[in-house]
Amino acid sequence: MNTQIIAIANQKGGVGKTTTCANLGVGLAQAGKKVLLIDGDPQGSLTISLGNPQPDKLPFTLSDAMGRILMDEPLRPGEGILHHPEGVDLMPADIQLSGMEVSLVNAMSRETILRQYLDTLKGQYSHILIDCQPSLGMLTVNALAAANRIIIPVQAEYLPAKGLEQLLSTVNKVKRQINPKLQIDGRKDFSWLSLYRQSVW
């Protein structure tokens, strides 16, 4: 199965990344696709929005999965993945993911830990969507290093548009140095419905 990995990123908060990720994922699932959502934000907003109000009480989250990869420890296929009634799977996140970002700073192959984890899942899903945190730290760089495409929700206003410069600079740097296959899939004023119509294939 050829897996499309899509990072949904913007270092500005409140632009609709989580809503885009959830609705696009459910829309793809309704179209018959096999979809995994990755919560890449230590705040766990995607995890909470999909019916898990206390992420810190979950037994296994993305920080655990990345920790296994980082320490070269065994990881059972699909371990920790939650199944949502609307047809999408979820790898949840909790506040421990912020500690993982600190651990990545001095790690070997630090930009590709998430990609190594997703490589264990690729054959199981047609689409993997990553909800990135509102920053350009190591977690977001990991998402960009793993993705085929990036969707950038942005409001059509001066300051949000101005903030795109730093994100696009990071995207171009990741593309040059780590992931030449990364493509920008969309920069548009947030409307999940139009985004869904233009992004489902």
Feature-to-residue mapping (PLM):
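P-loop NTP-binding core
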Residues: M1-W201
